[in-house]
Amino acid sequence: MSRVSQARNLGKYFLLIDNMLVVLGFFVVFPLISIRFVDQMGWAAVMVGIALGLRQFIQQGLGIFGGAIADRFGAKPMIVTGMLMRAAGFATMGIAHEPWLLWFSCLLSGLGGTLFDPPRSALVVKLIRPQQRGRFFSLLMMQDSAGAVIGALLGSWLLQYDFRLVCATGAVLFVLCAAFNAWLLPAWKLSTVRTPVREGMTRVMRDKRFVTYVLTLAGYYMLAVQVMLMLPIMVNDVAGAPSAVKWMYAIEACLSLTLLYPIARWSEKHFRLEHRLMAGLLIMSLSMMPVGMVSGLQQLFTLICLFYIGSIIAEPARETLSASLADARARGSYMGFSRLGLAIGGAIGYIGGGWLFDLGKSAHQPELPWMMLGIIGIFTFLALGWQFSQKRAARRLLERDA
């Protein structure tokens, strides 16, 4: 085995272990934020939505800067520093009794993610061969689902005692992850050339096709982020107990572990990436619309199952499509910018979703936020369809001219 192949194989195992630690640390804390501050402390959902949206926007919106800096200085220092900042954010969250302190803790957490998330994504693109990326992204998603359940179960159990224990556990896991990277991650370069920060950012901004695709995905993310805000609140309201939230993540884990990899393997042989992304988004959108009308836990979990199936179909295709569009000369910058759709959609989804949830509750129209999210998903589906048809038309024109 050549040294390059050996490095790739070792890199795969490193990425999987690193991802599990990050997912555990995140899901111990974040699914329980809405339960803690909305249900236990009586805050308005929009206040918590602002906190979650701030974290999302900071982490993903500034991702291009984190990626560009990593292109220049390498992945290791950015990842280690970012994970320590995330740990500090969780520690601060444990003592938050005022909205401004919760917002500050989410700001710290988001800045940490800005530093470590783009270089970690770029390492996947660097180490995994193009023809294997779809399957590897599916493995990461399966791991995400299992880690989400374990983290949510652990967090729910700790929440019975004290929310500070929840946050302390998340902080410790990120400190361990920082130590793991500091000890074992080689000083790998992310890009084929040592790209200056400004040049990497400029290269991305000139790629109009990539920019349009990323911004359109904001609508997709407005739906996706509700697993952290409105879906846990809805499950808690219908079940009457916060412990039911863990079953929501258990459903995701079961579906992901049984369906994600087989669906990815089968669909990559029969369907284009664009079609898989659009089909998944359509299922997610249609499953969102009736959520506000259900009154039983069984009906709610059925709709959540459909939503997760849509995500299982769409997410590996979205990741693979984003990676395939990235320029190898500025991988960090591209993978950082690819998070901008998540920044915009996540922020609007959290803040707007929280506001609509409060509005629907006060107006006795609980279906309002869910119908709006479904409509946004349908419009995003149509916008992506138009973009992909334009791209195919341009490709046919080039082939004819040749």
From Swiss-Prot:
Keywords: Antibiotic resistance, Cell inner membrane, Cell membrane, Membrane, Transmembrane, Transmembrane helix, Transport. One of its GO terms (molecular function) is transmembrane transporter activity. CDD domains: MFS_MdtH_MDR_like (cd17329). SUPFAM superfamilies: MFS general substrate transporter (SSF103473). One of its GO terms (biological process) is response to antibiotic. It is found in: Cell inner membrane. Induction: Induced at least fivefold by indole in a dose-dependent manner. The chain crosses the membrane at residues 13-33, 99-116, 139-159, 165-185, 214-234, 244-264, 277-297, 300-320, 340-360, 368-388. Residues 1-12, 117-138, 186-213, 265-276, 321-339, 389-402 are cytoplasmic. One of its GO terms (cellular component) is plasma membrane. Residues 34-98, 160-164, 235-243, 298-299, 361-367 are periplasmic. It is a multi-pass membrane protein. Confers resistance to norfloxacin and enoxacin. Belongs to the major facilitator superfamily. DHA1 family. MdtH (TC 2.A.1.2.21) subfamily. This is Multidrug resistance protein MdtH. It comes from Escherichia coli (strain K12).
